[in-house]
């Protein structure tokens, strides 16, 4: 499995948990952008 695909899956999982967390999701998305 290509590392890029693994990275996309990890980001998708993070985004999903961020949405599930509600208001906290915005800060999580900012962290993803900075990271």
UniProtKB/Swiss-Prot annotation:
The modification Leucine amide is found at residue 34. One of its GO terms (molecular function) is toxin activity. It is found in: Secreted. One of its GO terms (cellular component) is extracellular region. The keyword Protease does not apply. Its main location: secreted. Expressed by the venom secretory cell of the spine. The spine is a cuticular structure containing a single large nucleated venom-secreting cell at its base. It is an independent unit capable of producing, storing and injecting venom. On the back of D.vulnerans caterpillars, spines are grouped together by 50 to 100 to form scoli, of which there are eight in D.vulnerans. Keywords: Amidation, Secreted, Signal, Toxin. Residues 1-20 form the signal peptide. Belongs to the limacoditoxin-13 family. Probable toxin. Shows a moderate antiparasitic activity against the major pathogenic nematode of ruminants (H.contortus, EC(50)=94.5 uM). Does not show insecticidal and antimicrobial activities. Does not induce increase in intracellular calcium in mouse DRG neurons, suggesting that it does not induce pain. This is U-limacoditoxin(13)-Dv73. It comes from Doratifera vulnerans.
């Amino acid at each position: 499995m290509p590392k890029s695909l693994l990275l996309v899956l990890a980001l998708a999982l993070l985004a999903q948990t961020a949405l599930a967390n509600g208001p906290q999701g915005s800060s999580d998305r900012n962290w993803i952008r900075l990271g």
